[in-house]
């Protein structure tokens, strides 16, 4: 089982503004050569219109050799957050970039 928490900041080349990314997630992998990714967040809009994105995700991989991406939240305004979810056993979500 893998548990991680990371906080980082990136620069958005389109708006020349700095956006913070705070990610909290846990991944559990069962099987050979499996990869589980936790959550990741961020985005140009972010929540509250401040460029801050927070992602909470849980990645579970129960089949050997497959990938599951955690859930994503970001790229939306305070009233319209955008959520994306990867499927179990080989989801192709936009999170984790692995």
UniProtKB/Swiss-Prot annotation:
<comment type="similarity">
    <text>Belongs to the hssA/B family.</text>
</comment>
<dbReference type="Pfam" id="PF05710">
    <property type="entry name" value="Coiled"/>
</dbReference>
<protein>
    <recommendedName>
        <fullName>HssA/B-like protein 50</fullName>
    </recommendedName>
</protein>
<dbReference type="GO" id="GO:0030587">
    <property type="term" value="P:sorocarp development"/>
</dbReference>
<feature type="compositionally biased region" description="Gly residues">
    <location>
        <begin position="84"/>
        <end position="98"/>
    </location>
</feature>
<feature type="region of interest" description="Disordered">
    <location>
        <begin position="1"/>
        <end position="26"/>
    </location>
</feature>
<dbReference type="InterPro" id="IPR008455">
    <property type="entry name" value="HssA/B-related"/>
</dbReference>
<feature type="region of interest" description="Disordered">
    <location>
        <begin position="68"/>
        <end position="98"/>
    </location>
</feature>
<dbReference type="InterPro" id="IPR050533">
    <property type="entry name" value="HssA/B-like_chaperone"/>
</dbReference>
């Amino acid at each position: 089982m893998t548990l991680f928490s990371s906080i980082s900041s990136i620069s958005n080349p389109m708006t020349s503004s700095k956006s913070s990314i705070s990610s909290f997630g846990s991944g559990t992998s069962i099987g050979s050569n499996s990869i589980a990714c936790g959550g990741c967040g961020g985005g140009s809009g972010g929540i509250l219109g401040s460029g801050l994105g927070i992602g909470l995700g849980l990645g579970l991989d129960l089949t050997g050799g497959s990938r599951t991406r955690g859930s994503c939240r970001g790229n939306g305004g305070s009233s319209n957050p955008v959520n994306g979810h990867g499927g179990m056993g080989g989801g192709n979500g936009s999170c984790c970039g692995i």
